[in-house]
A protein has these predicted regions:
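Helix-to-loop junctions at the C-terminal end of transmembrane segments
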Residues: 82-95, 182
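A membrane-interface helix-boundary motif in multi-pass transporters
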Residues: 64, 178-198
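C-terminal transmembrane helical hairpin of 12-TM major facilitator-type secondary transporters
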Residues: 97-141
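Short amphipathic helix-loop junctions that connect adjacent transmembrane helices
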Residues: 51-66
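Pair of pore-lining "gating" transmembrane helices in MFS-fold secondary transporters
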Residues: 29-48, 131
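A late C-terminal transmembrane helix in Major Facilitator Superfamily
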Residues: 145, 149-184
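C-terminal membrane-cytosol helix-exit motif in multi-pass small-molecule transporters
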Residues: 1-10, 205-206
Length: 212
């Protein structure tokens, strides 16, 4: 079955340079930066985890490739469940409140992981709570995306593209820092504290977002 979804964007830029000229307007807008920060931070957790997670699995828990693969699948499951929840409650909760809720849940994940790992040394103590963290991220992404494109409505396309670029850059930088420092610190503590820091920053940026 084929359905023609007609074009809905009629204010197209003449060329790429015309689009780039709109970036200063976005870059100087707090309404753009706050949801973009939340969006980028909620994505950077994957950069941290997918560098730190395998290191912890091999160096700390000495897991087999099969078990490590199972443990590394938890983030995907959490993210999907978060997306499903958003689709059910988006009509009754504002996008800003969804961002705040997601940030709180994201923050709780590594806190629980850190607590359990220090009291009970087991792979699931570290990896299972990560599902909670990505569940929060799954709530944040759709909500923050909506806020980004609403920041300056006539620049929605530019905002979406620039926001995604910032998200990718921040995630890459987080992964870079993880790769540098994890070898010199306690791997579990470092990953958890780094993720907790991201959760705190995500919470404050979502809390300060001025929803339109």
């Amino acid at each position: 079955i084929m359905i023609d979804l007609k074009e809905t964007h009629f204010q197209k830029s003449k060329d790429i340079f015309s689009q780039i000229k709109t970036y200063p307007t976005l870059i100087t807008s707090l309404n753009f930066w706050l949801p973009t920060s939340t969006f980028a931070l909620s994505f950077s957790i994957f950069g941290i985890f997918f560098i730190g997670g395998p290191y912890v699995a091999v160096k700390v828990f000495n897991l087999s490739p099969t078990i490590m693969g199972i443990c590394l699948s938890f983030p995907a499951l959490g993210y999907v469940l978060g997306n499903i929840l958003v689709s059910k409650i988006a009509n009754i909760i504002s996008t800003k409140n969804l961002m705040v809720l997601g940030s709180v849940i994201l923050f709780l994940g590594p806190c629980i992981s850190l607590l359990l790992s220090n009291f009970y040394f087991h792979p699931l103590s570290f990896f299972l709570p990560i599902l909670i963290m990505t569940f929060g991220s799954g709530i944040i992404w759709p909500a923050s995306n909506a806020e980004i494109v609403k920041a300056i409505p006539h620049l929605a396309g530019s905002a979406s593209g620039l926001g995604s670029a910032i998200m990718t850059l921040m995630s890459s930088f987080a992964a870079f820092l993880t790769g540098i420092y994890i070898e010199y610190l306690n791997p579990i503590d470092f990953v958890c504290y780094f993720l907790i820091l991201v959760g705190v920053l995500s919470f404050f940026s979502s809390l300060c977002t001025r929803s339109k």
